[in-house]
Design a protein with these regions (language model features):
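Short secondary-structure boundary segments
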Residues: 19, 126-127, 159
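Short coil/turn connectors at secondary-structure junctions
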Residues: 12, 32-33, 51-53, 79-81, ...
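Active-site rim beta-loop-alpha module in soluble metabolic enzymes
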Residues: 70-134
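Short, glycine-/small-residue-rich phosphate/pyrophosphate-handling segment
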Residues: 49-86, 102, 165-185
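Glycine/small-residue-rich loop that forms an oxyanion/phosphate-binding "nest" at active or ligand-binding sites
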Residues: 1-46, 50, 56
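Alpha-helical scaffold segments in soluble metabolic enzymes
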Residues: 6, 27, 46-49, 66-70, ...
Length: 185
């Protein structure tokens, strides 16, 4: 939390939490007076604007329950088609930042399961997974813009969405609009 307060004192305009689980989101928002956004919350909001149902590809089966709980706490339960975990190990996921072939294939397989469950938008539930899918290292010829869809269903770039939500909150704050309610804090 102190690092967030220091960032605010140093003149940063916003804070972006780049872990999909949105750790400490409410605590950071209560602690500073600059916009605090997270890739998880922003992605869920944006996905509901893109389609009626979204599916989430998670990095670990161990986190699926917590992910579903968070989706419901944010009020998006009715939009959730499902959550599936990639079959890649943590090591393979890290290697995807250098060679995304395995990550793309694993994501496509998960995405197809979610599409069968009704997903109209696919959400990678990790900033690092998103980086690998978007940059698509060693896959640039086949995916010049990264993995942007699976069988016609869009893959959300959670990092870009989070960044754009943060930029929007900064712009609105500079225009005089409050960026967060302090009532619940």
């Amino acid at each position: 939390l102190q690092a967030c307060r220091t960032a605010e004192a140093d003149g940063f305009d916003a804070i972006l939490i780049t872990c999909f689980g949105d750790p400490m989101l409410d605590q950071v928002r209560a602690f500073v007076n600059i916009p605090v956004m997270s890739i998880g919350e922003a992605a869920l909001h944006y996905a509901t604007m893109m389609g009626k149902k979204f599916g989430i590809v998670h990095v670990s089966e161990k986190n699926i329950h917590e992910c579903v709980k968070t989706v419901h706490e944010y009020g998006f339960g009715e939009y959730l088609a499902g959550v599936v975990a990639t079959t890649e190990s943590a090591e393979e996921q890290a290697e995807a930042l250098l060679d995304a072939h395995g990550a793309i294939k694993a994501f496509q397989a998960c995405g197809r399961k979610l599409i069968d469950m009704g997903a109209e938008v696919l959400i990678p539930a990790c900033g690092l997974m998103t980086s690998a899918l978007r940059a698509a290292p060693k896959c640039e010829d086949e995916y010049p813009n990264g993995l942007t869809e699976v069988d016609g269903v869009p893959v959300l770039d959670v990092l870009s969405v989070g960044l754009k939500f943060a930029e929007m909150a900064v712009d609105l704050k500079k225009a005089g609009s409050p960026w967060v309610s302090r009532k619940g804090f």
